[in-house]
């Protein structure tokens, strides 16, 4: 219980980041084309790299920015492949919500680094309060649809334990203790790994876009980690 006794600003950063990001992400998907909303929201790794220059003791070098931009290009290739852009893109409320996602998650990550004295165990409290706020938002804005079979219940449990559970603890540890520029650039591997899992289970095919994304995202992560790789060779 001791790790839950944190300053109000810590709770504001933790809950604001976790709940705010997901609230605006779902809002973006409801009010803009999913591809466009996803691509805008996925500016957060690049913003983490850029905002890291504001942290004490951190130096932003050209290869950090180049690596993050290369990773963004890889994610863009993957997300935009096969899309028809015959119609011009028009700004919608969902686009602004997606930008809020990017700003919230990058801001949360950078501020978590700044609040490095806060134990990672406190994330459990942030998740609990976020879950309560998410329930209230669901009841106000959405219709309730229950899982239809045991597999769907298992999928819901898996999401709660993994991507919206354990992952938050790992992320907190990473942004507080890891190489934040390399972490930001390598985050572009998330959509790539999702696509590779779909390919592995036969739900998607291996295309030039996937191959190009592999090269760009991997290359971007390596480029952003140059100083880390140099240090390991000394």
Describe every region a protein language model picked out:
Residues 1-36, 40-41, 77, 160-178:
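Specific transmembrane alpha-helical segments of multi-pass solute transporters/efflux pumps
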Residues 3-8, 80-102, 140-158, 205-215:
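Juxtamembrane helix-entry segments on the extracytoplasmic side of multipass membrane proteins
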Residues 6-15, 60-72, 95, 117-128, ...:
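Cytoplasmic-side transmembrane-helix entry/capping segments in multi-pass membrane proteins
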Residues 15-19, 23, 45-50, 76, ...:
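Hydrophobic/small/kink-forming positions within alpha-helical transmembrane segments
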Residues 22, 37-43, 111-132, 161-200:
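Helix-helix packing/entry segments at the starts of transmembrane helices
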Residues 28, 54-60, 115, 122, ...:
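Hydrophobic/aromatic residues within transmembrane alpha-helices
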Residues 48-50, 54, 86-142, 156, ...:
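Transmembrane alpha-helical segments that form core, pore/gating elements
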Residues 51, 60-82, 127, 131-134, ...:
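Hydrophobic transmembrane alpha-helices of multi-pass small-molecule transport proteins
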């Amino acid at each position: 219980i001791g790790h839950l006794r944190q300053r109000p600003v810590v709770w504001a950063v933790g809950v604001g980041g976790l709940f705010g990001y997901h609230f605006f992400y779902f809002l973006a998907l409801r009010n803009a084309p999913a591809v466009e909303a996803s691509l805008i929201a996925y500016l957060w790794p690049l913003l983490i790299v850029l905002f890291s220059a504001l942290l004490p003791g951190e130096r932003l070098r050209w290869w950090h920015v180049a690596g993050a931009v290369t990773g963004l290009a890889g994610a863009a290739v993957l997300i935009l492949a096969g899309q028809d852009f015959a119609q011009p893109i028009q700004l919608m409320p969902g686009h602004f919500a997606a930008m809020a996602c990017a700003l919230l998650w990058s801001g949360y990550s950078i501020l978590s680094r700044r609040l490095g004295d806060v134990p990672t165990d406190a994330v459990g409290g942030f998740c609990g309060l976020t879950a309560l706020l998410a329930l209230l938002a669901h009841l106000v804005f959405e219709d309730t649809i229950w899982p239809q079979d045991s597999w769907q219940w298992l999928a819901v449990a898996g999401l709660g334990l993994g991507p919206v559970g354990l992952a938050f603890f790992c992320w907190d540890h990473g942004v507080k203790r890891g190489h934040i520029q390399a972490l930001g650039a390598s985050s572009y591997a998330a959509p790539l790994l999702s696509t590779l899992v779909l390919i592995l289970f036969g739900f998607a095919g291996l295309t030039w876009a996937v191959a190009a994304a592999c090269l760009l995202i991997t290359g971007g992560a390596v480029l952003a980690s140059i100083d880390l790789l140099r240090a390991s060779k000394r």
